[in-house]
Amino acid sequence: KDGYPMDSKGCKISCLISDTFCDTECKMKKAKSGYCYSRGLACWCEGLPENVEVWDKATNKCG
């Protein structure tokens, strides 16, 4: 699956322009790849395993 990975507080992992940083963060969660989604200023992962939690507006616990 694809989605925004979360930090330990349930927030999206923010980024500015570093695709390398996001790619590393995503691969640590077993994704195929990741990049910095500039509109959201957050990392976006592609190819995550189904059991990895991703940020969802409906279940947002960040803050």
From Swiss-Prot:
Keywords: Amidation, Disulfide bond, Ion channel impairing toxin, Neurotoxin, Secreted, Toxin, Voltage-gated sodium channel impairing toxin. The modification Glycine amide is found at residue 63. SUPFAM superfamilies: Scorpion toxin-like (SSF57095). Belongs to the long (4 C-C) scorpion toxin superfamily. Sodium channel inhibitor family. Beta subfamily. One of its GO terms (cellular component) is extracellular region. One of its GO terms (biological process) is defense response. It holds the Pfam family Toxin_3. Signal peptide: none annotated. Residues 1-63 form the LCN-type CS-alpha/beta domain. Beta toxins bind voltage-independently at site-4 of sodium channels (Nav) and shift the voltage of activation toward more negative potentials thereby affecting sodium channel activation and promoting spontaneous and repetitive firing. Is highly active on insects, since it provokes paralysis and death when injected into crickets. This is Ct-IT2. Transmembrane segments: none annotated. Expressed by the venom gland. Its main location: secreted. It is found in: Secreted. Disulfide bonds join 11-62, 15-36, 22-43, 26-45. Has the structural arrangement of an alpha-helix connected to antiparallel beta-sheets by disulfide bonds (CS-alpha/beta). Gene3D superfamilies: Knottin, scorpion toxin-like. GO terms for molecular function: sodium channel inhibitor activity; toxin activity. It comes from the Eukaryota. InterPro entries: LCN-type_CS_alpha_beta_dom, Scorpion_toxin-like, Scorpion_toxin-like_sf, Scorpion_toxinL, Scorpion_toxinL/defensin. PROSITE patterns: LCN_CSAB (PS51863).
